[in-house]
Structure formats: structure tokens, C-alpha cells
Amino acid sequence: MKAPTVLAPEQQKDKWQELLAFWCWFPDLFLDACTPKDPETGQKIGIELDPSQRMFMRSMFRFERTYHCYSRGWGKTMVELLTNYTKCVLVPNTQIFLTSSTMKLAANLIKQKHAEVLRFYPFLEGEIEKASLRENGAYIIFKNGSRIDTLPNSQDAKGNRGNQICSEESALLTKAVFDDAIEPIVSEPYKNQRTQKRHPYIVNGLHFITTTYYVSTDAYRQNLNYAQEMIDLDGSAIFGASWRLPIAFGRGRREADVLKIKTRVSPLFWLTNYEERWIGGSSNSLVDTMTLIKSRTLENPEIESDGKNEYYMGVDVARSENDGNNQTSIVVVKTLRD
């Protein structure tokens, strides 16, 4: 029997560098290599990533900017966390921020899926130094210096610095907040830990994961910009799919169960959360949808007339036999006269 060849330390280092570079380009294959197997049957235990999930992971490693619009039930948060955990393991001293509308929502995303991630990939538990999963903020510290933290999509995120942002429900993110508080977080490039020079192959990332919304929002315009940058090979990529994609790969609910939901919800909810269609009449409307929605909430509600101004009431009476769309809407408008 031929004895195995033992490589010199320098040769071993070269091989490990090649393998690390390969896994950074194909992070899904790294998880495949680390997937536990049944000791008796030899069959893999846990998740078998499908092509759409593999594309998701690879895009977040390879591109500086990505926008993902997937339906409910696609498994966005789970695959997003798998990608972030994998990057933290493969790239030492990486700082990743997971953001959402509020700090509580961002923390809950990790809190709900952390145990599930470790159950499917037990090796990750040995890579984690400390994990704090609280409602007012969550963080995970890895033994190689990498870290995942949570932030809100608001001005409260200002001043932080990191290498990657994953923004959940980013359709609600306005351009003003993005430009002022979110984008500057990844302004500093990832540096080689030994030389402190810019790393030539590790890029900072801005990644957005959401369901669709109105075309008259900053998020839709950002999608158009990323689409053009994708055409120009300028570091961006966009992806999207309806509820049919996970079903086609045998994941999630059955088709009949999803179609039952359609009968219970409004048409707009169905289009944006399951069909993944951007809705609305014009992407260049005079009134921004997010500004209009924000104006619907009064800081100090008026319970009765002040006797000085005029009030108008508009009523849209529901006439649908469909319970999901049988909702009457009432709008009260106050007119301020000069």
C-alpha cells in the first residue's frame, strides 16, 4: 500500500489558499462539504440547497450590490443567515450588519433562525465564540474575529462601520435614510489582516432582501438602477421570483395551500407578497408613496372639529363577495384655508 504524500508546510498553505478561494466563489459547496451524514446510511442530514438558493448565496459573495425580491415562503431569511454565517467563517474579521425596519425586527430575524441554522450545520457551533439573542438587539461573535450585528433602517444606524449590510424588507427603506445612514456603513474597504491594505478579492456588500411594493418608491428606482448596472457589468445583480419557484423545487407549502391564501387576502397584498409584482400606476409620480403613507399617521389626532377649518370625508364602500377584498375604506381630509 502506497503511503500518502505529505506536503511541506508551504505547499500545504498554498493548497489551503486555493481551497479557500474556491469556497469563497462557491459558498454553497462549502456547506455541502460540511453537511452532516447519517453514520449508518451515509445519507446527508438536513438541508439540500436547490439551484435558486445556491444562486442567492453565490451572488452575495461575488457582487457588491444585490437586490432580491422573493415571495413569502421562499425562505429568504434562512438562506440569508446561512450566507452570512458562511462568510464570517471563511473571511476572518468580517463585520456584517443585518438591518430591518426596527431593531426589534432585525434581532428577531436572527433569534428565530439561529437554532435552526446550528441544527442543520452543527459545525458552525464550534466556530462561534458568543451569541446574544435579545429582542432589543442581537449579535454573534465568531472565534476568528468576525461578527454579525443588528441595526434598524433609520438614522440610529449612523456612525457604524462594517463590510456587509443585509437589509430585510428594504422596500420600505427611503433614499434619504439609505444615503445618510446605511450606505456609509460599508464605505471602508475590507483590509488584509496582516498588511492592513485593501484586500483585492474580498468586496464590501450591500444586499437587499424583500417582497415587492409600490413603483413610486425609492426601492423600485433602486431596482432599476441595479438592473442597468447589471447590464453594464458594474457590480450589481437583481433577482426575483413568485411563490411558484419554491414549489417547483419541492420546498414550502403545496400549491393548493398557497392558492387558498389568495381567496383570503386583498389583490394588492397577493401581488406584492406572492406574485412579486411592483404595483402602482407610475414610477415617476409627483407624490412619493412612502411620503404619502407617512402622512397618514397624525402625531396629535383630532377627535372633534376645531370650528375654524373644513373637513371632508370620503368613503369607498366594499361591494366584493370575496372576504379578502370586502373592506370599506374611510378617509378624512382637513382643509386649511388661507
Where are the predicted features?
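Phosphate/NTP-binding elements of NTP-utilizing enzymes
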Residues: 2-315, 332-337
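Short acidic, Gly/Ser-rich segments with clustered Asp/Glu that frequently serve as metal-coordination loops
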Residues: 317-325
